[in-house]
Amino acid sequence: MTDEGGKNQGMKVMGILDIQNTPCARESILHGAGGSLVAGLVHFLATSRVKRSFDVGVAGFMLTTLGSWFYCRFNNAKLRVQQRMIQDGIKNKVIYEGTNLDPTQKKTGDQ
Amino acid sequence: MAHPTQLGFQDAASPVMEELLHFHDHALMIVFLISTLVLYIIIAMVSTKLTNKYILDSQEIEIVWTILPAVILVLIALPSLRILYLMDEINDPHLTIKAMGHQWYWSYEYTDYENLGFDSYMVPTQDLAPGQFRLLETDHRMVVPMESPVRILVSAEDVLHSWAVPSLGVKMDAVPGRLNQTAFIASRPGVFYGQCSEICGANHSFMPIVVEAVPLEHFENWSSLMLEDA
């Protein structure tokens, strides 16, 4: 069975989240795991309460994953907008070069 | 196009579908986190030895589990509404095509410049050439120029149908006596498949939609050829 565009069959966490093919997912989960470990460990070292440390670890996982996810997706969205603007700019430059609609020509014309 | 055992969306072929994919990733991540939390709480509840039969109220947790879901819903609603309004934008289409649903085929009319119209019937399984897709191929494809906004006016001649192409992020009901409008931009050349998405009788599953996005000069050549053949 061939996959679309040569994509690998991604690893699905909990059967739903495709980490490999979803942008920012892998980084967010890894940051979440790290944050969970740190939060749980620090709490345990401070209080020696095992169960509560696990709770803090899970809360840390959720908050770190969410924070990392939003930050990465926001930057990703900005990059996509820039990419689209650059693509349109290249296309317009190719189409309008040498005509009176050429944006570079307008700037030199104003001087 | 779809492949066997596929669970997720097809690759996006239009900017709107790209945005929908991104929103889906966003919503799925939130769903994943909620599921993780619920699973953890279930395991904690099942494995605890603590029991307290005298809890009457608990203001703090009630406040948390009221405000937190509200915040989560706002985080989902804002991008959702953004895409909803994005999908309703019709930005000066370069081409208008009428897609009419019949029992059981689609017909397309390109009437901007000349009167070009043709029917699009499914290719029966026994007539498929090697490499063609069963129940998806048609004898005539709807050809559109790539990277150009295209408006589709969808209606039906008999019963309800629905014109849908998943990779373009388009689905619009074809209602007899009503003209529905949708639009898309095919960001890359290719062949995009869809199927009728409203039950319309015995052969509802056998009236597919095929959209072929080509560079503008190829589109012009194709339309000239089609007019000559008509």
Swiss-Prot record, chain B:
Q: Which PROSITE patterns match?
A: COX2, COX2_CUA, COX2_TM
Its keywords, alphabetically, are: Copper, Electron transport, Magnesium, Membrane, Metal-binding, Mitochondrion, Mitochondrion inner membrane, Respiratory chain, Translocase, Transmembrane, Transmembrane helix, Transport
Q: Where is the signal peptide?
A: none
* EC number per UniProt: 7.1.1.9
Q: Which residues are exposed on the Mitochondrial matrix face of the membrane? A: 46-59
Q: Which residues lie on this side of the membrane: Mitochondrial intermembrane?
A: 1-14, 88-230
* Biological-process GO terms, alphabetical: ATP synthesis coupled electron transport
Query: What InterPro entries does the annotation carry?
Result: CcO_II, CcO_II-like_C, CcO_II_C, Copper_CuA, Cupredoxin, Cyt_c_oxidase_su2, Cyt_c_oxidase_su2_TM_dom, Cyt_c_oxidase_su2_TM_sf
Q: What class of enzyme is it?
A: translocase
Places the protein is found: Mitochondrion inner membrane
- The entry marks the following residues as binding Cu cation A1, namely 161, 196, 200, 207
Q: What is its main location?
A: mitochondrion
Q: Which residues cross the membrane?
A: 15-45, 60-87
This entry carries the following GO cellular component terms, namely: mitochondrial inner membrane; respiratory chain complex IV
Q: How is the co-factor bound, per the entry?
A: Binds a dinuclear copper A center per subunit.
> What catalytic reaction does the record list?
4 Fe(II)-[cytochrome c] + O2 + 8 H(+)(in) = 4 Fe(III)-[cytochrome c] + 2 H2O + 4 H(+)(out)
Sequence positions that bind Cu cation A2: 196, 198, 200, 204
The annotated subunit structure for this chain is: Component of the cytochrome c oxidase (complex IV, CIV), a multisubunit enzyme composed of 14 subunits. The complex is composed of a catalytic core of 3 subunits MT-CO1, MT-CO2 and MT-CO3, encoded in the mitochondrial DNA, and 11 supernumerary subunits COX4I, COX5A, COX5B, COX6A, COX6B, COX6C, COX7A, COX7B, COX7C, COX8 and NDUFA4, which are encoded in the nuclear genome.
- NCBIfam families in the record: CoxB (TIGR02866)
Please give the family membership noted in the entry: Belongs to the cytochrome c oxidase subunit 2 family.
* Role: Component of the cytochrome c oxidase, the last enzyme in the mitochondrial electron transport chain which drives oxidative phosphorylation. The respiratory chain contains 3 multisubunit complexes succinate dehydrogenase (complex II, CII), ubiquinol-cytochrome c oxidoreductase (cytochrome b-c1 complex, complex III, CIII) and cytochrome c oxidase (complex IV, CIV), that cooperate to transfer electrons derived from NADH and succinate to molecular oxygen, creating an electrochemical gradient over the inner membrane that drives transmembrane transport and the ATP synthase.
> Which protein, by its recorded name, is this?
Cytochrome c oxidase subunit 2
Give the organism, scientific name: Carassius auratus (Goldfish)
